[in-house]
């Protein structure tokens, strides 16, 4: 009797051990088995369980955890530039001692305030000398602004009332040069452009090229 019970106990323990071993082999969790629940090879397998990608994106925005955001194209503060279009939003290509640089749109100096450079004055104002060799102030452009195809360094030198701004001209087999030209978008210009001063209808002088003139809408 005791021998029979011992044999039975050994058989039970052996069966339990075998079952545990087979379970360890076949009862393993596979993420592919739950592909529709946020795991496995579904398109959203990289997102936390139970969250749609839109929810994760919103949380990342709130927590400022977007590490892989691609920087806005174009140059940024104080970077070299040729036209306004080369700069980030809110910056303009301004002429400096080191050439064109992306700088804040307007320095904000008002009419009559002392200035040192053209780009220190608000749009529509130019930095002009009032005491030779000593003092410059911001004032409206005087008569005699540069006309079509005349050399320039900044758009404030050109007659904006006729739709002109300072543009980098590139012609075949010629060295690039800055000159006053007609424009449709201020992005092609160099420096601040007072578009509110442009006359709606511009009369062309004889010999000027009839290219598209900027018009207010």
From Swiss-Prot:
Extract the signal peptide range.
1-21
One GO cellular component, as annotated: extracellular region
Question: What does the entry state regarding organ or tissue expression?
Answer: ITG-like peptide: Expressed in corpora cardiaca (CC), corpora allata (CA), antennal lobe (AL) and gnathal ganglion (GNG) (at protein level). Expression in AL detected in all animals, expression in GNG detected in most animals and in CA and CC detected in few animals (at protein level).
Major place of residence: secreted
- Locations listed in the record: Secreted
Q: Which GO terms of type biological process are on file?
A: neuropeptide signaling pathway
* Keyword line: Cleavage on pair of basic residues, Neuropeptide, Secreted, Signal
Positions of the propeptide segment: 22-208
Q: What name does this protein carry?
A: ITG-like peptide
């Amino acid at each position: 009797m005791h021998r029979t019970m011992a044999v039975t106990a050994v058989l039970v323990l052996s069966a339990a051990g075998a079952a545990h071993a087979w379970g360890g082999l076949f009862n393993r969790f596979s993420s592919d088995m739950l592909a529709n629940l946020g795991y496995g090879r579904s398109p959203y397998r990289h997102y936390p369980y139970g969250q749609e990608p839109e929810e994760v994106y919103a949380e990342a925005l709130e927590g400022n955890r977007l590490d892989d955001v691609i920087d806005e194209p174009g140059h940024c503060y104080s970077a070299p530039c040729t036209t306004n279009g080369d700069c980030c939003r809110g910056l303009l290509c301004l002429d400096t001692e080191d050439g064109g640089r992306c700088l804040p749109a307007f320095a904000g100096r008002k009419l009559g305030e002392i200035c040192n450079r053209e780009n220190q004055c608000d749009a529509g104002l130019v930095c002009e000398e009032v005491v030779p060799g000593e003092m410059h102030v911001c004032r409206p452009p005087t008569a005699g602004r540069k006309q079509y195809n005349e050399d320039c360094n900044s758009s404030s030198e050109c007659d904006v009332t006729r739709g002109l701004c300072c543009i980098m001209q590139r012609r075949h087999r010629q060295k690039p040069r800055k000159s006053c030209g007609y424009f449709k978008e201020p992005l092609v210009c160099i420096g601040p452009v007072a578009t509110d001063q442009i006359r709606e209808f511009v009369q062309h002088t004889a010999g000027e090229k009839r290219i598209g003139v900027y018009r207010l809408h």
